[in-house]
From Swiss-Prot:
Species in which this protein is naturally found: Oenococcus oeni (strain ATCC BAA-331 / PSU-1)
Broad class of where this protein is predominantly found: cytoplasm
GO biological process: leucyl-tRNA aminoacylation
Catalytic activity entry: tRNA(Leu) + L-leucine + ATP = L-leucyl-tRNA(Leu) + AMP + diphosphate
Name of the protein described by the UniProt record: Leucine--tRNA ligase
Motif 'HIGH' region: chain residues: 41-52
Motif ('KMSKS' region): 582-586
Gene Ontology, cellular component aspect: cytosol
Enzyme class: ligase
Annotated Gene3D superfamilies: 3.10.20.590, HUPs, Isoleucyl-tRNA Synthetase, Domain 1
Family membership noted in the UniProt record: Belongs to the class-I aminoacyl-tRNA synthetase family.
Residues involved in ATP binding: 585
Encoding gene (name): leuS
Subcellular location as annotated: Cytoplasm
Top-level taxon of the source organism: Bacteria
Length: 810
């Protein structure tokens, strides 16, 4: 007998909606809080894929589990709805991005609701809602006031031949030096951008990782991205140009005696000033040649090294040697000082460059064979004057002392982390609330006038402005403003990146309808920080780092009560195709969750995705295994029901105690496994329990009710239905979580082998608390043992309960 999943799921989803079953209780409820959330989705036109329910079910299990354990649970959902795909679609089709984004959200929400997640929908947020991005703009204004938001000339990807007069494209839209759409040539050019000074928080972002319950791999990725290192700044004067010096940062100042040339990034501001007339043409040609290369291409270790000589020389401060200054694309202006001292004997990239351009290679650390390759290991110093015979640590300390004493450099802590380029030349994003005035002044839009709303643009206005500005430059009536004193101004045309709205959304869920403040301080104090945050590992760095940065900034302002937003982070594994490949349309292996829900039911999909394997591991999809889960749920249905609407008559009030042990084992294991997010093994244990119920003559009602509670977090619809049929008037959602009796789990009997003269001749079941004499009597009374010793004399019996029985005979 199969249950009607369509009718049951529709009935309970309607019930939960109408009764607002999962509306979060007030902060004054007196209950301890549990704040659990997923990384909110971008509502694409494609809708949900089977990867979404995996992480959503995981958080829903934790939400439902903790509600029954007496926690006040906040589990919200929202939409990260700004983004490039919507704008590209709008330009292509002529539809307004706001309109079809809202349509996408409706479709997404319908799909999410069909899976029975226990969200508090009264807290739903949408990053494109002006009442939401009012506060995104407000945070930007606070950053601006504190000097953490500023404008700077930044290298961008500029496609001047793009239809409409040119466009700035993101790194991910550049393929082999051309635009993804239309294959127009892309050039790296400087353009004014808004930048956030995340580097001011580098040390705190690094050190506070230690206090977080996050996967170590994610923390390590953030540490590497922040990239703290200790080394030295070294100053090289330019020969013949006493006004100029090149500053380099190096973690190995001890190799200074091995520096045989220098390399500047082609964009370095000294390049034009120091290049000689003889080398000017080569340098200009080289700069033009690499203008379209992305940072990723430029730093590819497998690429052949290229460069151009400037004709200038730097003076090595430690020995006065003149060394040639080159430019090369493998040095980036955005990292360090945009200049390096090259020690080819001990650096692989420098070695390859030196070999290609026939530059000197001078060994200063003992070891290896530098005629074949760079030696990058540790060793004692050679050819290094006063550093000779010192090891790495000693030499670094000594050379830094020397540099500081001679004003030629100093010890320095450096970070790989760069300031966050915050502006995009796009329409579909939060407007940056800044006005540029004709008199050169720059002001923020007054807080009382926020939100600064996006103007409606038609299809023609949505096209590139042709100036490198966003399409907002085409919205003249919105763009141009006049001050009270008659001075004219222009609004900022750049918009914020998609990361902006997701950098603080977890705070707005706490108080989503407050129009006076970002969120009520008392509510923030009660709910923060997030107890469990679940999402993909692909957001390991950018989203999580930006959210931590904004949160720390708001903490410094006294807005939020915690230093960190997310206490525990879990990354779900990927659901792969049946062939273990990533699901994609091109491979034809995409599974549509709507079809699964229609054919097998939402509960079957939820249970299956949790049963596939550990949450954090990648797993291949199997429709056969899904069908097996559906059969299991049908078995659950059959053990509880009889024909019609009745309950199975063997479910009775009295307890014959035959299920005591398996029931208590199941409650214990499921409770512990849910708490540790081991959902697959919890489900396995519940399968064992149901198998045992089919062998029983009577099923205690107390145990069967409790089983429904155990299964409910994974399969909420079928359990709500059966809970009601068991005679309950209220929803199962807030029923008190079952407890177990440890004494019922402990083994009351154990099997022991009986040896005769050291050989096993029989096996007996004995009580665990049996005495030695009783154990000896049980052994000798055993019929098999009696036969073996019938014609023999028993010399002695060694009987140790729980360990050994050995009868010695002659």
């Amino acid at each position: 007998m199969s249950y009607d999943h369509k009718a049951i799921e529709k009935r309970w989803q309607t019930y939960w909606d109408e009764h607002k079953t999962f509306k979060t209780a007030p902060e004054t409820s007196g209950k301890p809080k549990y704040y659990v959330m997923n990384m909110f989705p971008y509502p694409s036109g494609q809708g949900l894929h089977v990867g979404h329910p995996e992480s959503y079910t995981a958080t829903d299990i934790m939400a439902r589990f903790n509600r029954m354990r007496g926690f006040n649970v906040l589990q919200p959902m929202g939409w990260d709805a700004f983004g490039l795909p919507a704008e590209q679609y709008a330009i292509k089709t002529g539809h307004n991005p706001a309109d079809f984004t809202n349509e996408n959200i409706k479709h997404f929400k319908k799909q999410v609701k069909s899976l029975g997640f226990s969200y508090d929908w009264d807290r739903e947020i949408n990053t494109t809602d002006p009442e939401y991005y009012k506060w995104t703009q407000w945070i930007f204004e606070q950053l601006y006031k504190k000097g953490l938001a500023y404008e700077d000339e930044i290298m961008v990807n500029w496609a001047p031949d793009f239809p409409g007069g040119g466009i700035v494209v993101a790194n991910e839209e550049v393929i082999d030096g051309k635009t993804e759409r239309g294959s127009y040539p892309v050039y790296r050019v400087p353009m004014k951008q808004w930048v956030l000074r995340i580097t001011k928080y580098a040390e705190r972002l690094l050190s506070d990782l230690d206090d977080l319950d996050w996967p170590e791999a994610i923390k390590e990725q953030q540490r590497n991205w922040i990239g703290k290192s200790t080394g030295a700044a070294v100053f090289f004067k330019v020969d013949g140009k006493s006004d100029y010096q090149v500053e380099v940062y190096t973690t190995r100042p001890d190799t200074l005696f091995g520096a045989s040339y220098m390399v500047l990034a082609p964009e370095h501001d000294l390049v034009d000033k120091i290049t000689t007339s003889e080398c000017r043409a080569d340098v200009d040609a080289y700069k033009a040649k690499i203008a379209s290369k992305s940072d990723l291409e430029r730093t590819d270790l497998n690429r052949e090294k290229t460069g151009a000589f400037t004709g200038a020389y730097g003076i090595n401060p430690v020995n006065g040697e003149k060394i040639p200054i080159w430019i090369a694309d493998y040095v980036l202006s955005s990292y360090g000082t945009g200049a390096i001292m090259a020690v080819p004997a001990h650096d692989t990239r420098d070695y390859e460059f030196a070999k290609k351009f026939d530059l000197p290679i001078r060994q200063v650390i003992k070891g290896g064979d530098i005629s074949k390759e760079a030696f990058t290991g540790d060793g004692t110093h050679i050819n290094s004057a006063f550093l000779d015979v010192l090891d790495k640590k000693q030499a670094i300390e000594k050379i830094i002392d020397w540099l500081e004493e001679h004003d030629a450099g100093h010890k320095q802590v450096n970070y790989k982390l760069r300031d966050w380029i915050f502006s995009r030349q796009r329409y579909w994003g939060e407007p940056i609330p800044v006005i540029h005035w004709e008199d050169g002044k720059q002001t923020l839009v007054p807080e009382s006038e926020l939100p600064l709303r996006l103007p409606h643009l038609n299809q023609d206005q949505m096209k590139p402005s042709g100036t490198g500005e966003s399409p907002l430059a085409n919205a003249k009536s919105w763009l141009e403003v006049t001050r009270q004193d008659g001075v004219k101004g222009r609004r900022e045309t750049n918009t914020m990146p998609q990361w902006a709205g997701s950098s603080w959304y977890f705070l707005r869920y706490i108080d989503p309808h407050n129009d006076k403040v970002l969120a009520d301080p008392e509510k923030l104090k009660y709910w923060m920080n997030v107890d469990l945050y679940v999402g993909g590992a692909e957001h390991a760095v950018l989203h999580l780092l930006y959210a931590r940065f904004w949160h720390k900034f708001l903490y410094d302002l006294g807005i939020v009560p915690t230093k960190e937003p997310f206490q525990k982070l879990v990354n779900q594994g990927m659901i792969l195709g049946t062939n273990h490949e990533k699901m994609s349309k091109s491979k034809g292996n995409v599974v549509n969750p709507d079809e699964i829900v229609d054919s097998y039911g939402a509960d079957a999909l939820r249970v299956y995705e949790m049963f596939m394997g550990p949450l954090t591991q990648s797993k291949p999809w199997s429709t056969e295994s899904l069908a097996g889960i559906r059969r299991y749920l049908d078995r659950v249905w059959r053990i509880f029901t009889s024909d019609g609407d009745g309950i199975n008559p063997i479910i009775v009030s009295e307890n014959d105690h035959k299920l005591d042990k398996i029931f208590n084992q199941t409650v214990k294991k499921v409770t512990e496994d849910y708490a540790a997010m081991r959902f697959n093994t919890a489900i396995s244990q519940m399968m064992v329990f149901i198998n045992e119920t089919f062998k029983a003559e009577k099923l205690p009602k107390k145990y069967m009710n409790a089983f429904l509670q155990l299964l409910n977090p994974v399969a909420p619809h079928i359990t709500e239905e059966l809970w009601q049929r068991m005679g309950h008037q209220e929803t199962i959602a807030y029923a008190t979580w079952p407890t177990y009796d440890e004494s019922q789990i402990i083994e009351k009997q154990i099997e022991m082998a009986v040896q005769i003269n050291g050989k096993v001749r029989a096996k007996i079941n004995t009580p665990v608390d049996i005495s030695r004499d009783e154990l000896a009597k049980m052994a000798t009374d055993n019929p098999d043992v009696k036969k073996q010793v019938a014609d023999k004399n028993i010399v002695k019996i060694i009987a140790i309960p729980g360990k050994i029985i050995n009868i010695v005979v002659k």
